[in-house]
C-alpha cells in the first residue's frame, strides 16, 4: 500500500477554440513528442472538414462519435483456483472517455488516407455513423463481455 496519500487528478484546461475539455483530451492524445501546436492543427483541421462535409456542427458530430465508441462493459482477468477467468465489469465514466479517445486515435493512425487531418475527420464521421474500426473495437469488447457473462458473479 502507498505510504503517501492519493495523487490529485490534474484538471484539464478547455481548448481555446471550442472551449471544451474533451477536445483538449483528444488533442493531447493525438500529440506526439510534445508538439501540441501540430496536434491542434490536426484536430481543428479535421473539425473543419467534418463541418464542410456534413454541414452539422463538428462538436456535435464528435460527441455522437464518442458515444458510439465509448464502451459500457469490458472484461478483466481474474485468477481463481488456478484458472483465469475473463470477468465482465462496468466501465467507469472517466475510463470510458479515455478508452474511447485512445481507440479513436489508434484506429485513426491505422487508416489509409493521405494526411492525419483526413484520417481523423473520416474516422470521426465513420464513428458518428456507427461504422469504422473504433466502433468495431467497442463491439468486440462488448462481445467478449457478453460471452463471459457466466463469470459475472466473480466481479471485484
Swiss-Prot record:
The keyword tRNA-binding applies. InterPro entries: Ribosomal_uS7, Ribosomal_uS7_bac/org-type, Ribosomal_uS7_CS, Ribosomal_uS7_dom, Ribosomal_uS7_dom_sf. CDD domains: uS7_Bacteria. It comes from the Bacteria. GO terms for molecular function: rRNA binding; structural constituent of ribosome; tRNA binding. Keywords: Ribonucleoprotein, Ribosomal protein, RNA-binding, rRNA-binding, tRNA-binding. It holds the Pfam family Ribosomal_S7. One of its GO terms (cellular component) is small ribosomal subunit. Coiled coil: none annotated. One of its GO terms (biological process) is translation. Belongs to the universal ribosomal protein uS7 family. One of the primary rRNA binding proteins, it binds directly to 16S rRNA where it nucleates assembly of the head domain of the 30S subunit. Is located at the subunit interface close to the decoding center, probably blocks exit of the E-site tRNA. Part of the 30S ribosomal subunit. Contacts proteins S9 and S11. This is Small ribosomal subunit protein uS7.
